Design a protein with these regions (language model features):
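Conserved Class I SAM-dependent methyltransferase catalytic core
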Residues: 1-21, 34-36, 205
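C-terminal substrate-recognition regions of SAM-dependent nucleic acid methyltransferases
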Residues: 21-259
């Protein structure tokens, strides 16, 4: 597929999402494409295929030309345990943590598996962690010494977005993204966007994530519920500081007009 999409002599003539239109009583997930190749003509490499002409046009104008210009580069996965310190005080957890006790990651169900997490803060330096328990978002606390503090955004502001969201429809609204403060972490249920020194920049990033433009660009690669880091590759990175060409003090609708 990558070879064909990089071939300047290749083009798509027609896409049909419902394969049964062309092949009766046949289910082909993803649909059917009618393609054409002429070695004597150059149509320009497709790179990324979408079935929407308008979206193809937007993508050619606005999509990042390299990963450094993509919001994907500012997306970070869940926090992790400092297992050496955890097992020193609580060797019993080695039997319940995955990969025979070697899995550092705050997995989706970690609140149920490891009782070191508490509903109330026990000490001033405890890390507040956002996760899901019994199908509800909950905040729990864990002593800082049991958490790897080298994580990219643990000590800074960030925006959290659910790692599984919607159904993959183009431009669909993201499920309640939230701004998280320094010394607050998150489980595998979420991805973290940004690592900001000041709250204002995180709030600006939140507005961007809610914008129709951002959701449309996300929809280029997000075709399922999965909202992992790579699906954000076509979303352009923005300057979220006060020096930006975009006036972030405006409403999301007004920011969309600037984008």
């Amino acid at each position: 597929n990558e070879k064909m999409l990089s071939d300047p002599h290749f083009k798509v003539l027609h896409y049909e999402s419902d394969a049964s239109v062309m092949f009766t009583n046949t289910e082909i997930k993803g649909g059917v494409v009618i393609s054409y190749r002429d070695k004597n003509k150059s149509y320009g490499a497709i790179r990324v295929f979408t079935p929407y002409e308008e979206l193809n046009s937007i993508m050619k104008k606005a999509a990042p030309t390299n990963e450094a210009e993509s919001l994907m580069e500012n997306i970070y996965i869940q926090n992790k345990f400092d297992l050496e310190k955890l097992y020193k005080d609580h060797p019993e957890y080695r039997a319940v943590i995955g990969s025979e006790g070697r899995d550092k990651r705050f997995r989706n169900n970690i609140f149920e598996k490891v009782s070191i997490f508490t509903e109330e803060r026990q000490n001033k330096g405890d890390i507040r962690v956002l996760g899901v328990s019994k199908n509800k978002r909950v905040w729990m606390y864990i002593p800082e010494k049991y958490v790897e503090t080298e994580h990219e955004n643990l000590k800074n502001w960030k925006v959290l977005v659910a790692r599984v969201n919607g159904s993959g429809n183009l431009g669909e609204v993201l499920s309640t993204p939230v701004v998280e403060a320094p010394n607050e972490g998150y489980t595998q249920t979420f991805i973290g966007i940004g690592s900001f020194k000041v709250e204002a920049e995180a709030q600006n990033a939140l507005k961007y994530i809610k914008s129709k433009f951002c959701r449309t660009m996300l929809g280029i690669l997000k075709i399922t519920q999965d909202n992992n880091r790579d699906t954000w590759r076509m979303v352009p990175l923005q300057d979220f500081t006060a020096h930006s060409d975009i006036d972030w003090s405006k409403s999301v609708a007004e920011i969309d007009q600037q984008l």
